[in-house]
């Protein structure tokens, strides 16, 4: 991922990560009713059918299998949510650590720009620097972060090739 993209998507990713975290914390999974409904035959049978026993093979199969399938579906869905959360968290953590490595004052300025709560004029007044200096600081941060992303990518490639 590129630094410029992270600058644009940072707040959206933070919101998505918080949403996924909440989903994971309050995970209840599929209900038994939803699982049984998904396992039942939803289409209409073709032609006339005569049933000679009290319970169809499908009904017995559903009764015997639904708990195992429900547990598997819930585990798969939880894993999907967790993997998505972990991927976003990894990107945000890398990005934020890169910003922090700029130094305290520069990092504070960049985080103010990312938060979007203040205008550039308000940030420049708060830190006693010009808008031009803010623009330069943003560009320098993006250049630095792009180098970090390139280094991470090289290390991942090196690992995969070893």
What is the role of each PLM region?
Residues 101-118:
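Short amphipathic alpha helix immediately N-terminal
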């Amino acid at each position: 991922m590129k630094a410029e993209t992270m600058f644009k998507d940072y707040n959206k990713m933070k919101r998505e990560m918080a949403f996924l975290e909440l989903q994971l914390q309050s995970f209840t999974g599929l209900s038994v009713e939803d699982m049984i409904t998904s396992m039942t035959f939803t289409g209409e049978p073709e032609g006339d059918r005569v049933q000679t026993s009290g319970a169809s093979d499908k009904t017995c199969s559903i009764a015997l299998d639904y708990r195992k399938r429900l547990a598997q579906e819930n585990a798969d869905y939880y894993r999907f949510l967790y993997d998505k959360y972990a991927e976003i968290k990894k990107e945000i953590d890398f990005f934020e650590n890169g910003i922090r490595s700029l130094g305290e004052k520069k990092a504070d300025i960049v985080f103010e720009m990312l938060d979007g709560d203040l205008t550039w004029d308000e940030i420049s007044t708060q830190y006693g620097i010009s808008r031009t200096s803010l623009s330069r600081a943003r560009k320098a941060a993006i250049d630095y972060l792009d180098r970090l992303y390139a280094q991470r990518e090289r290390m991942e490639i090196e690992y995969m090739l070893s």
